[in-house]
Regions:
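Intrinsically disordered, low-complexity cytosolic regulatory tails
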Residues: 1-38, 77-80, 297-308, 315-387
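Glycine-rich ATP phosphate-binding loop
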Residues: 66-87
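Regulatory alphaC helix of protein kinase catalytic domains
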Residues: 96-101
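Short beta-strand micro-motifs within the conserved protein kinase catalytic domain, predominantly
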Residues: 113-124, 132
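Catalytic-loop of the protein kinase fold
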Residues: 170, 175-188
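Conserved catalytic-loop aspartate of Hanks-type protein kinases
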Residues: 242
Length: 387
């Protein structure tokens, strides 16, 4: 078999030259095929089996798919992650289409790059760039060597990267509401650069949804502990639903506690989110901090960071900031943290001005959102509740 000429790695037809430079030309899709069939590399199942040593190294699993590490051998060698969807599930098929039908979302450094796909019979696969440092969830909750524990500055940088990725999704045409923002869907590359992943539940919506009062009515789905409570009550999905989920992520990154942990409920009589927010209201933010972190946090930066998490996790969507505002505030906090570490002068009063004392908010319609408010049969509290 004679290999066909490799495509020009700098051609505008190939948005990811570092991957496309070594691929042989794929079979031309039918003209009636979906647009994404002409945007991404089409692999054969034989190629994926060869790349993964017959799917021998599983690196992740979710309700409707498994993820395997693979190696594409060619003119430019590349380690990849291959997602294998459950071939007996209609939901898996829908999730595959959700990943493939949002092609423009890949054009941002903080969004995971889709390389290609494979369809063979009822089998569906997607191929992504490989993230050596795994997920933020894994870094926060696995029993890591203390030497590799994420520093406060590194956590800030990761949060900024993730926020930029979400902001990008919220600013396109159409807009994308991710609907599953959580630490396990924020991946980390070799340089600890954060990338948003897993668009199985995402919704494409018109740009008019950028208006604060606009929404999409949809079946409630997401992960318990990260779902917007306003979305739970009303069934109305907005851009601010992602903002709420990111607020939970900010608190989790700071504390290394999962939102569904029962230890706080048993000790304090309140759930983790209520405890986080109460600590901010009572100016006890230090109690939230991951005790494994060294004392390296500028106090004013800590207060400002906690205030952003507090505002994002407001039960009322209209009171939450936009992701653009979140990015700006986090970048400012990182700047002052760097000044603090370098012993350079900065203005704590200026930083404190973005973190006024929070005010308590009344629960939505008198509802308190305990973990028992949603029941999911055959799943534990960490599993996905999908539509």
């Amino acid at each position: 078999m004679v290999a066909s000429k490799s495509p020009d790695p700098y051609s505008a037809k190939h948005p990811f030259p570092n991957f496309f430079s070594f691929w042989r030309k794929a079979k031309k899709p039918n003209e009636d095929s979906p647009p994404w069939t002409r945007l991404y590399r089409m692999f054969t199942l034989k190629e994926l089996r060869l790349a993964t040593d017959n799917f021998g190294l599983k690196i992740g699993q979710d309700g409707h798919y498994s993820v395997y590490k693979g190696f594409i051998n060619g003119g430019f060698n590349e380690t990849v992650a291959i997602k294998m969807y459950d071939n007996n599930s209609l939901i898996s098929h829908r999730h595959f289409l959700s990943e493939m039908e949002l092609p423009w979302k890949r054009d941002h450094p903080n969004v995971l790059s889709l390389i290609g796909y494979c369809i063979q019979g009822s089998h569906r696969y997607t191929v992504f760039e490989y993230m050596p440092h795994g997920t933020v969830h894994g870094q926060l909750h696995s029993k890591n060597d203390p030497k590799t524990l994420l520093s406060w500055k590194k956590r800030l940088e990761i949060c900024i990267g993730a926020a930029r990725g979400i902001q990008f999704l919220h600013s396109g045409n159409p807009l994308i509401i991710h609907r599953a923002i959580k630490p396990s869907n924020i991946l980390l590359d070799n340089n600890w650069f954060a990338k948003i992943s897993d668009f199985n539940l995402s919704k494409m919506v018109p740009t008019r949804l950028s208006d604060s009062d606009s929404h999409v009515s949809t079946v409630i789905c997401g992960t318990l502990g990260y779902i917007d409570p306003e979305y739970i009550v009303s069934g109305l999905l907005t851009l601010k639903s992602d903002v709420y989920s990111f607020g939970v992520v900010l608190f989790e990154v700071l504390s290394a506690r999962k939102p569904m942990e029962r230890s706080i409920l048993e000790e304090q009589g309140i759930n983790v989110m209520q405890w986080w927010r109460q600590c901010v209201e009572d100016d006890r933010v230090g109690e939230i901090m991951d005790p494994r972190m060294k004392v390296e946090v500028a106090p004013d930066c800590l207060k400002a960071y906690a205030d952003i998490a507090y505002k994002c996790s407001n039960e009322r969507g209209s009171e939450r900031p936009s992701m653009a505002d979140v990015v700006k505030r986090l970048e400012l906090i990182l700047l002052f943290q760097e000044c603090f570490e370098a012993d350079l002068p900065f203005s704590p009063s200026w930083l404190a001005s973005i973190a006024p004392s929070p005010k308590k908010n009344e629960p939505l319609s008198g509802v308190e959102f305990q973990d028992s408010d949603i029941s999911v049969s055959d799943y534990d509290s960490e599993e996905l509740l999908r539509d």
